[in-house]
């Protein structure tokens, strides 16, 4: 009998750009992880509360709130404060604010997928396979 194993770890992707979200979802799934997607900060907070992901990938430039506000709300909430957050942005000047605000890491976009998987592996403490299903952005 064949059984399909469910992914054991969940990654919440909070990203407003659909094409970048698709790329991140592919990489997360390829690594055997379960992706959750939100396109707004408010949606991301709702999903974080509902599903309690193991990690959050956060675009800092959101449509409904500043990514730094999202970080603060996550870190203030007792159920969410220990969830690691990897912030991403095309603006490298946001790095210090993100790290000071409580992010575990910051990646400058466009992110190389092998670099992203290295960072995800670090925070999930799980050995992940990496073989790009697509070309790097």
Describe the residue ranges of each PLM region.
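Residue-level signal for the "D+5" position in two-component response regulator receiver
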Residues: 37, 62-65
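Alpha4 helix (beta4-alpha4-beta5 surface) of REC/receiver domains from two-component response regulators
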Residues: 69, 90-108, 115-118, 122, ...
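The feature encodes the CheY-like receiver
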Residues: 63, 81, 109
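Acidic catalytic/metal-coordinating carboxylates
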Residues: 40-43, 66-69
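Two-component/phosphorelay signaling modules centered on CheY-like receiver
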Residues: 18-36
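Hydrophobic/aromatic residues positioned on beta-strands within the core alpha/beta folds
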Residues: 86-88
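Active-site beta3 strand of CheY-like receiver
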Residues: 51-62
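Non-catalytic signal-transmission and effector/linker regions of two-component phosphorelay proteins
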Residues: 1-16, 114-137
């Amino acid at each position: 009998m064949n059984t399909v194993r469910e992914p054991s770890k969940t990654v919440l992707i909070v990203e407003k750009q659909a094409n970048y979200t698709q790329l991140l979802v592919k990489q997360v799934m390829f690594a055997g992880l379960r992706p959750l997607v939100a396109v707004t900060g408010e949606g991301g907070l709702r999903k974080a509360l509902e599903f309690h992901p193991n990690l959050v990938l956060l675009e800092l430039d959101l449509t409904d709130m500043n990514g730094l506000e999202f970080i603060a709300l996550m870190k203030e909430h007792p159920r969410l404060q220990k969830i690691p957050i990897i912030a991403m942005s095309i603006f490298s000047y946001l790095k210090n604010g993100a790290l000071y605000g409580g992010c575990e890491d910051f990646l400058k976009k466009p992110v190389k997928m092998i670099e992203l998987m290295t960072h995800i592996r670090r925070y999930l403490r799980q050995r992940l396979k990496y073989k790009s299903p697509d070309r790097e952005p």
